[in-house]
Amino acid sequence: MVMIRQGMMKDCTDLLEVYQGTRWFYRTREGGYSTVEQVKYEHRGAAFERWGWLVAEEKGHVVGEIVFRTERTPSGGKIGIIRNLDVDVRNQKTAIGTRLTNAAESIMRDRKVVRVIATTPPAAYNYWMKVKYFARGSIANLTLPLSRLPENRTSKIKMLTLRNPNKLPNSMNFSHVAYPGSLAELAAQVVDRRLTGKLLEYYLKDRLIGVGVVAKQDDKTARFVVDVTKAGIGHSSAVISKTAKTATAWKVKSVVTSIPKDQMGMYSPLAKWSSEISTDIPVTRLL
């Protein structure tokens, strides 16, 4: 008999064995998982919501989990984001993944979510098709040497740096033109001090029109994500340029970002980016 319940930190002991099997999660830890503390680390931080953590328990052991959260949209509605779904390799194809997914959808439906998004590697694509998710677009990974990014000197738009936030700012829990979840995930890494970075807000006549996060990925590269409101669409070039250029303080050589491929039109007028289509697949379902 399998029971679906809210996750607890003590479950991480069992989840270590799950994580050491086949992990279908695009943010998988480099080098894998060898300690319970590493698993606990995945269940902390600014982007983690305790209400959005369910586990599947069978005969006193946790054999799977699903982690999810919600984001606001410009229309005032909400989308749901499945951050990960993992089932012990010995329990796959036993409907546990389906039960976890359905339970998560039920909670998100109660929270007025209208659409759910997950990011899946090709190996797990068939599972999402079976639970009535469908592929929607693709993800483009962009790279550009900082020296090739033109300076945007507009004085109309004011950039505000958020100093030492201790939680995810409301302005960053938002999806419009950025890939859903990407802004909040990178912002959380900065808030949690897992990466060195900056959280930025952009204003036009005291009205918030955009947000950006930039973080030092390694000695040569910084990663950034930007999003804009409906009123900020016409100023997206300034938001992109100012956010990416902030990385010059760390003396990195290039910047990278991942965006929905259909938003390339926002980036291509700025510079000639190196572009590569991600193997990860965005899938979605209307609730």
Segments from the language model and where they lie:
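Amide-forming acyltransferase catalytic core, primarily the GNAT-like/NAT-type
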Residues: L15, R27-H43, A47, E57, ...
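Hydrophobic alpha-helical core bundles mediating ligand binding, dimerization, or RNAP-core interactions
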Residues: L16-R23
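Conserved beta-strand in the GNAT
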Residues: W53-V55, H61-T70, I81, D86, ...
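Conserved acetyl-CoA binding element of GNAT-fold acetyltransferases
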Residues: G76-V89, D219-G232
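Conserved acetyl-CoA-binding loop-helix of GNAT-fold acetyltransferases
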Residues: V87, K93-S106, K130, G232-A247
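Hydrophobic, ordered structural segments
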Residues: Q92, A104-E105, V113-F134
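Conserved GNAT acetyl-CoA-binding A-motif
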Residues: T101, M108-P121, A249-I259
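Active-site/acyl-donor-binding loops of N-acyltransferases
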Residues: N126, V131-R153, K253-L287
